[in-house]
Amino acid sequence: MNFVQPVIQWASLAPILIVLGAAVLGVLIEAFAPRRVRRPVQVTLALLAAAGAFGAIAWRWAEVIGGGGGAPSTVVVGQLVEDGPALAAQGIIAILAFVGILVIAERGRRGAPGSEDAFAPQGASVPGSDYEDRARRAGLVQTEVYPLVLFSVGGMLVFPAAGDLLTLFIALEVLSLPLYLLSGLARRRRLLSQEASMKYFLLGAFSSALLLFGIALLYGYSGSVAIGEIHAATQATTGMDGLLVVGLVLLISGLLFKVGAVPFHAWTPDVYQGAPTPITGFMAACTKVAAFGALLRVVYVVAPAMTWDIQPFLWVVAVLTMVVGTVLAIVQTDMKRTLAYSSVAHAGFLLVGVVAMSPEGISSVFFYLLAYGLATIGAFALVALVRERDAEGNVTAEASHLAQWAGLGRRSPVVATVFALYLLSFAGIPLTSGFVGKFVAFAAAIDGGAWPLVVVGVLASAAAAFFYVRIIVLMFFTSPAEEAGAPSTTVVRSQGFTAVAVALTAAATLVLGVWPTPVLDLLAQATKFVV
């Protein structure tokens, strides 16, 4: 028996290796570096890893898509795929991860009130215990979050590029497990944070079971877990369509959990509310990109032969997601829960682009993900800066109740104005990136014959504008309630990381709304999947 040595295309793996290598190096830094230098070293390493990954992705794009001599293909013995959609998803993830790490690194200006990061000084301590109190007084800083974030980003880079379903599952676990931990590390409201972590873990395990069951059925149908071979089996196999449809529905359901689509959205409001706010922004933006990248590959590569069987399922999920997300967002009184249900509604709008089943649908989904992700990270970055101040003048938890945002436009007009920009983008108001994202997604759906979904999407967008405008009215045209002993609202001064992140995301929201053509043209090249 002759053993054939597998050929590994190291250049194609460069973005993933950069991020995972930096994550491993971050673990070694935690073990051996002096405590005083860990934070600056970890922040620098994480930012360089995200920037380096984006540079490697840009290089691979030039080689594979830009005519540099390469071609879209499967790599690492078919375990991964290097094609336009995979590189587009990876590039967006790298951009959002860089901005998200900037927000995670924020700890307030030294000596100013609230000059602490968002993470518990000792994650393993019992909330309110003497151990936690001693860790807080000692000024301990949880720098393990940076390698955890990088491990999650590494899984996200693999997820949309997976060439077989086992690689897809492993990538799902690699991106999810760090997020389960990070969700329970909030410095403030520790019990709520730990509850969010437990709910996310339990429901995530349930979704993983659905995904695995779907993989098992698809393997039984095709005799392979390779996505390309399953596609080939759909063209040749007859008499087993029931097995294929059930397997696809279960597999897609597992992916829809990560997207936050109805009825797989139950974790979203609780986790978004309880997790550290910077992690919420990172998770809401980056996880969505990775999950939609994988969903597009499954729907466009495996499911085309079963379009008439799968499309009704996706249509129902899209309608429910848009309607339920919008209606429940309207009745929320907590800012983070409002943005959580807004995220659910946006998942529905993105699904409208997915069901277009056309190249324009693919490029529109990626543009929407970029626009939504940038605005989301910026919005949660500002939520983390708006805090409560008690009667003694101590700055405490985030001012997450909507009533606490009343009059913010007078106290901090810059913060309120930029936050209003993000809200207008979420609402799809012209001259913002959110408008262009919705427009191209809905246009692709109309061309694909899904005009009823577009009608529902337009009506849901109009209804969603109510709660976005309500927050803007609160900030600029409502006086804050003054109750004796009630905490006031203040905006903590940024150390600089959040200021840079907000400046980048706000500028991108405007530029992509006014001049989206270069990005749309670039993404139009990333619409062909390798089978």
From Swiss-Prot:
The chain crosses the membrane at residues 13-33, 45-65, 85-105, 150-170, 200-220, 242-262, 289-309, 310-330, 339-359, 365-385, 415-435, 460-480, 496-516. Keywords: Cell membrane, Membrane, NAD, Quinone, Translocase, Transmembrane, Transmembrane helix, Transport. GO terms for molecular function: NADH dehydrogenase (ubiquinone) activity; NADH:ubiquinone reductase (non-electrogenic) activity; quinone binding. GO terms for biological process: ATP synthesis coupled electron transport. GO terms for cellular component: plasma membrane. InterPro entries: NADH-Q_OxRdtase_suN/2 (IPR010096), ND/Mrp_TM (IPR001750). NDH-1 shuttles electrons from NADH, via FMN and iron-sulfur (Fe-S) centers, to quinones in the respiratory chain. The immediate electron acceptor for the enzyme in this species is believed to be a menaquinone. Couples the redox reaction to proton translocation (for every two electrons transferred, four hydrogen ions are translocated across the cytoplasmic membrane), and thus conserves the redox energy in a proton gradient. NDH-1 is composed of 14 different subunits. Subunits NuoA, H, J, K, L, M, N constitute the membrane sector of the complex. This is NADH-quinone oxidoreductase subunit N. It comes from Beutenbergia cavernae (strain ATCC BAA-8 / DSM 12333 / CCUG 43141 / JCM 11478 / NBRC 16432 / NCIMB 13614 / HKI 0122).
